[in-house]
Regions:
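A short, compositionally biased N-terminal segment around positions ~18-40 that is enriched
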Residues: 24-37
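Contiguous surface segments at macromolecular interaction interfaces
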Residues: 13, 28-31, 53, 67-157
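Short coil-to-beta transition motif at edge beta-strands of beta-rich domains
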Residues: 36-47
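Short, charged beta-turn/beta-strand-edge "cap" motif at the junction between a beta-strand
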Residues: 48-54
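A broad, low-specificity signal marking well-ordered, structured residues that form hydrophobic/aromatic
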Residues: 3-5, 24, 45, 101-104
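Short, basic/aromatic beta-hairpin or loop at an interaction surface
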Residues: 1-2, 8-27
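Short glycine/proline-enriched turns and hinge-like loops at secondary-structure junctions
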Residues: 19, 38-40, 54
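Short beta-strand-centered aromatic/proline hotspots
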Residues: 55-64
Length: 157
């Protein structure tokens, strides 16, 4: 699968990815939600800065860590242990302090020719798609949440 990852423009997430100071993305929630347990090594990540409308950077998933039912202390320890790769501000640490964590480490980052996103009203900040063309203007299709559903294969407790 291919993943489209929205990057917070206020925290300059994409700039940190581009300058190499950020090599891991975090997503969290009170319960498992995208991309928890749905992203795997060697899959492709495409990055888009919120508000830009342009998909401009690509990378490959190197490693994924999924956590559930964490205590406050465990959350803090996991974030602190990985913060050299995450490069989170204190505000971001607070934002991502939730019981279910998904840490996605990536490598082979490259700048690509910008592609215009065909934005649909139901899109989340992390999309799981078959190909990047599925969300690019001129070749897009209606976003299908089937790719985001839990399956028996990735349904961990």
């Amino acid at each position: 699968m291919v993943h489209l990852v929205y990057c917070d423009n206020k925290e300059k997430v994409l700039a940190k990815i581009l300058n190499g100071s950020k090599t891991m993305i975090i997503r969290s929630a009170s319960g498992r939600k995208i991309p928890h347990s749905r992203v795997f090594s060697n899959e492709e990540l495409y990055f888009i800065e919120k508000g830009s409308g342009l998909i401009s950077t690509k990378a490959t998933v190197k490693n994924v860590q999924n956590f559930v039912k964490l205590s406050d202390e465990e959350i803090k320890d996991i974030i602190d242990k990985n913060n050299l790769k995450l490069n989170l501000s204190e505000k971001q640490k607070e934002r991502w302090h939730k019981k279910c964590l998904c840490l996605v480490e990536f490598d082979r980052m490259e700048i690509i020719n910008p592609m215009k996103l065909d934005h649909q009203s139901n899109m989340d900040d992390w999309l799981i798609i078959n190909t990047i063309e599925d969300v690019v203007e001129g070749t897009s299709i209606q976003y299908n949440y089937e790719n985001s559903k839990m399956t028996a294969f990735n349904n961990i407790k």
